[in-house]
Design a protein with these regions (language model features):
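Short, surface-exposed, polar/charged, turn-prone segments marking secondary-structure boundaries
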Residues: 22, 29-30, 35-39, 62-66, ...
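Short Pro/Gly-enriched beta-strand edge/turn motifs at strand-loop
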Residues: 16-20, 69-75, 134-137
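Conserved FAD-binding catalytic core of PHBH/FMO-like flavoproteins
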Residues: 45-54, 79, 86-99
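Oxyanion-binding "anion nests"
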Residues: 61-87, 91-93
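A broadly tuned preference for mixed-charge, low-complexity surface segments
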Residues: 43-67, 140-162
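A short catalytic or substrate-binding loop motif that flags glycine-/basic-rich loops and adjacent residues
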Residues: 28-30, 81-85, 147
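C-terminal catalytic lobe of FAD-dependent flavoproteins
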Residues: 85-88, 92-100, 106-191
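Central helical "cap/lid" subdomain
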Residues: 2-63, 133
């Protein structure tokens, strides 16, 4: 057991174990995404991340622009399976010449432990078309994060001395430290 003046439970994506009843009121879901590490058949000397129009309609900063509507319409017309599986191509180089390729988005209450091979095949096909060369996949994995709550994050006071902090988007690593600072200040005041 744990004892403390204040305890903050930081969830990650597990909304069904600790404080499940309090979490159920938020009606949260999770997102499971598939990722690949691949080697290109030729030296691409790629120095920066590569995004496509698929990414532009996935991220709100771009998707909310009026110009994105035409891109979204083309995707829905020509490749509805990409929209259905939340596939948007991101390619990031590693220092060793490999490429990190992703990703897909599968939303629900539970994350299947099994990847969909067809989703990987579509991402490989998109990457090869975009890069203009074949790639060899050397690793596959999935990520899971909390998603689609009542806002981008929640901070609940579950009981006296017990709080819960949850992210509902895939930006936890980016904004997590600021969220922690804000939540601690809410409990004890600014530093």
């Amino acid at each position: 057991s744990f004892r403390g003046e204040q305890i903050i439970v930081c969830y990650g994506h597990d909304y069904q174990t600790l404080l499940a009843q309090a979490m159920a009121e938020l009606n949260p879901s999770i997102c499971r995404l598939q990722m690949l590490r691949a080697r290109p058949a030729i030296n691409l000397n790629l120095q920066h991340a590569l995004l496509t129009g698929l990414s532009c309609v996935h991220y709100g900063a771009f998707a909310d622009l009026p110009e994105a509507a035409a891109v979204q319409a083309q995707i829905l017309r020509d490749a509805p399976h990409l929209h259905e599986h939340g596939i948007h191509l991101l390619i990031s180089p590693t220092p060793h010449g490999d490429l990190i390729i992703g990703d897909s988005h599968d939303y629900g209450r539970d994350a299947s432990p099994f990847n969909a091979e067809q989703v990987d095949d579509w991402m490989i096909e998109l990457a090869e078309q975009t890069l203009g060369c074949k790639i060899q996949v050397v690793e596959r994995w999935q990520g899971v994060y909390g998603s689609r709550g009542p806002g981008p994050f929640s901070f609940l006071r579950v009981a006296p001395g017990l709080s819960a902090a949850l992210m509902h988007t895939g930006v936890g690593m980016s904004v997590g430290p600021a969220m922690a600072e804000r939540n601690i200040a809410a409990l004890w005041g600014p530093a």
